[in-house]
Structure formats: C-alpha cells, structure tokens
UniProtKB/Swiss-Prot annotation:
Lumenal compartment residues: 32-75, 245-335
Species the sequence originates in: Rattus norvegicus (Rat)
Name of the protein in its database record: Thromboxane-A synthase
UniProt superkingdom: Eukaryota
Known EC number: 5.3.99.5, 4.2.1.152
Tissue distribution: Expressed in bone marrow, spleen, lung, thymus, liver, uterus, and macrophages.
Record's keyword annotation contains Manganese: no
Reaction equations catalysed: prostaglandin H2 = thromboxane A2; prostaglandin H2 = (12S)-hydroxy-(5Z,8E,10E)-heptadecatrienoate + malonaldehyde; a hydroperoxyeicosatetraenoate = an oxoeicosatetraenoate + H2O; (15S)-hydroperoxy-(5Z,8Z,11Z,13E)-eicosatetraenoate = 15-oxo-(5Z,8Z,11Z,13E)-eicosatetraenoate + H2O
Cofactor: heme
Keywords: Endoplasmic reticulum, Fatty acid biosynthesis, Fatty acid metabolism, Heme, Iron, Isomerase, Lipid biosynthesis, Lipid metabolism, Lyase, Membrane, Metal-binding, Monooxygenase, Oxidoreductase, Prostaglandin biosynthesis, Prostaglandin metabolism, Transmembrane, Transmembrane helix
Cytoplasmic side: 1-10, 97-223, 357-533
Chain ranges passing through the membrane: 11-31, 76-96, 224-244, 336-356
GO molecular function, one term: monooxygenase activity
Amino acid sequence: MEVLGLLKFEVSGTVVTVTLSVVLLALLKWYSTSAFSRLRKLGIRHPEPSPFVGNLMFFRQGFWESHLELRERYGPLCGYYLGRRMYIVISDPDMIKEVLVENFSNFSNRMASGLEPKLIADSVLMLRDRRWEEVRGALMSAFSPEKLNEMTPLISQACELLLSHLKHSAASGDAFDIQRCYCCFTTNVVASVAFGIEVNSQDAPEDPFVQHCQRVFAFSTPRPLLALILSFPSIMVPLARILPNKNRDELNGFFNTLIRNVIALRDKQTAEERRGDFLQMVLDAQRSMSSVGVEAFDMVTEALSSAECMGDPPQRCHPTSTAKPLTVDEIAGQAFLFLIAGHEITTNTLSFITYLLATHPECQERLLKEVDLFMEKHPAPEYCNLQEGLPYLDMVVAETLRMYPPAFRFTREAAQDCEVLGQHIPAGSVLEIAVGALHHDPEHWPNPETFDPERFTAEARLQQKPFTYLPFGAGPRSCLGVRLGLLVVKLTLLQVLHKFRFEACPETQVPLQLESKSALCPKNGVYVKIVSR
C-alpha cells in the first residue's frame, strides 16, 4: 500500500509539472503575439510580425532602406512593430501637417524608450510637456542671428585647422576619406562652441574630450540584448536602468563635470572675458526671466528663408518667474545634445555635399564662381552675409538634405485618442515621420534619385507642396539648432571651396552606399581627391 501511495504521489507530481509546463508555454505563445493585432484593428497595413521581436528583422539592413520599402509596399500610411511597441509611419504631407502643426498640442512629445542617457533625457530633445516648453522658450534667444554672429569667429577658427589638414591632402595628391576629416573638424567645433574648450582632435586624439567623444559614438546595443529588451520591455527597461553601467556612468560624469567646471569659471569672469559661445548663450538664457511662447517656436521656416536677417518676427514674451531656471544637468544636456546633433548631422551633411559636388563637376564649377565673388565682397563672412549672398550654395545644401536627410525619421507620441484625417490614433501611439520616404516620393519630387539643385530656386520653392521637405522637421518642435547647423555647414563649405575643389577618383564609391542607425551616413566613408585652387 505504501508503494502504491508513493507511486501515486510521483505520478501526481509529474502531472503537475507537465501541466505547469504546458500552461507556461501557452502563456509564452500568447505573450509572443498578443501585441500584434493593434495595427490590423486600426486598418493600417504592415509587414507580418514575428513572435516576440515583431518586425525587427525587417530592419536588419537599417531603417533607411526599410522605410523606402514600407512606403513602396504599403503606401504613405503604414506601420510596424519593434518588439511589442507599435509604430504608425506616415509620409503623407497632409497628415504630417495635422500632426506637427494643426494638432500639435496632442503630439507635443517625442517617444521615450526609457533607456536614454541622463544627459539626453535632460536635453530639450527629450524633455516633455510643460518643462519642454519652458526650456525651449528660454533657449530660443541663444539661436538669434545676433547670437550666431558672435559664434561665427569660433567656427572660422576651427575651419583654419581643417584647411591646414586639407592642404596636406592636396599636396600628396592621394585619395583620402574626407568624412574622417569632417569628423575631426566637427569635434573641434563642438568642443569650442558647446563646451568652451579648444581641442585638435586630428593631431591630438589622446585629448580626454576627444577620447570620450569617440566612446559616445562607438556605443551600440548588441542585437541579442536589443531583441531581449524589445521582447520584454516591462522587465528589461527598468532592469537596464538600475543595473550598474560603468561606461554610461563615466561618460555622464565626464561631461557633467566638464560643464560644471566651465560654468564655475564663467561665474568668475567679467562679461568682457567670457567667450561668445553656445554655452554662454545658454547661461545667459538661464538668467533671463522671459521666454517666447509656443506660437513662436518654429525656427525652420525662418532659417530656410534668406530674408530672416531683415529682422526677426516679433516674439510674444511671457514672464517665467514661476518656471524653474535651467538646472546644471539641463545645461549639460543641451551641450551634450549639441555634441550628438552637431557631430553626426554636420559631419554627414558635409560628407554628402562633398560627394555630390565631386561627382557633379558642373554644379561644383557654378558654386566655385559664386564662392569667389562672395569672398571678394566679404573676406570675413558674418552670419547675415551667409544668409543673403550665396543662393546657389543654399540650393546645393537644400538638395543634398533632400536626397540624404541625416535625420531621416523622427517620432511624436499621441497624448489622447484622436483622429488624423479620418484615421483613428489611440492615446499612447507612436507616430513616425518618414522623412526619407517623403523626400524620395516621385509624386512630390520627380526623378528623386537625381541630384538637381534647381529644385530649390526661389521660384521652384513657391511651387513645392507644403510639408514635403522636412530635413529639420516642422512646427513648434522642429529642430531648435537649425540656424546654427546651417551656419556651420555653409561657412565650412565657403572656406574650403575658396581654397580647394573636389574631384572624384577610382576610390570614390558610386553610387554611395549608406548606413542608417541613429542617423543617415556614408557606410564606407567618402573617398575623393582634393586640388588646390
């Protein structure tokens, strides 16, 4: 009897184990696909998702090619899943206008993953709701034409180092990767303009600032870990935030300490002793007791107009005595954001322009003539000179940003349930603006793969359908640093093309292969020859 009882217990234990295993497997199977019915219920077309990871493998070649494929397969309104998160992708200009402008109050925030470094989380890029509005309003004055004119000499100083290195490349006559030169140059610009220090990243790569910048840009999340985070976000995201991360803590500590030291130094200096850099503009804005309102936040329209230096439009100021001043962490966040955006986007834009000029010599010749005439009139260029006197350069830059927009996708998050041109959007949904797909839509841009600066003559701009050209976004949350970014690009090209011309060579990759992770960039560099003029 005892043997039978023991056997019965063992059988019962086995049954329980098997039953629990079956239940667990059933729950896992349900969990692996339970989030993947939302797009279908909304009537939005999308690729078939895989269990747990959604459409992660669809993007294995990068987001650039995949966005173009999404548009071709599913149209200007489609979607996908990354892990359990649903993305609604739009490249229809009328829907984009509704999201970015007409219904901005419901789409004022960017998507946050919860894994952003503290320096990014404290920047105007990722701040949310009222705090974003306060900080953005306070920072607007730092990007006025007058303030940018004060920063122009610092950028010109960094250009001198770049010209010196290009002179050696011209003398050698060898092909070289000019993207690497631009990378060093933009590091120098960011160090000077955003952090208030002087570095020479090409000749002194051991500089601590340069070393830490390289660590920032070398970081990437391993694909297996990314798949795990996307599959189990409610567990993995909080876990990743609390687990020790030596690299993250060291980078955050370095840049935060650097900013604090510079701020302490500026506090001891007189107004005349302080550098006219971006950091000082932010510090000045912090001390200001007024800011502009949301209705004046869109800087892109003005920045893309040559008439902006005729006087800024009146900005409605609101007292901000009840708003908390920028914290040191937030000031560090703005400088760090300048590092990320200024380095990646400026480097890639300069690289793409160089490639296009080298492979389109007739366009380069026309631009060289304009540059020479401009430099005769303005040997020491200022911000407003650059806005008014280089129309063909503006056209070349604009067409490059159409073909190769470095920031080729960005997100908005729906605060409440709403409808956008008849499409229901649930609260919490992430909308992704597919700038790359929009810029390569033949309906709006005939022969989109052809480099044609004539698309951006003054007359042609008037014929463009609104919200079909978005290299800097649009609306109140468009790129805050658009003026400064264009200033760096245009001043650099002006200085370089006044001394050199670009030539394609056997090492030049045609067509250019692209890589798209956080930003669009040349995959294998840009190899050209450079010739002294």
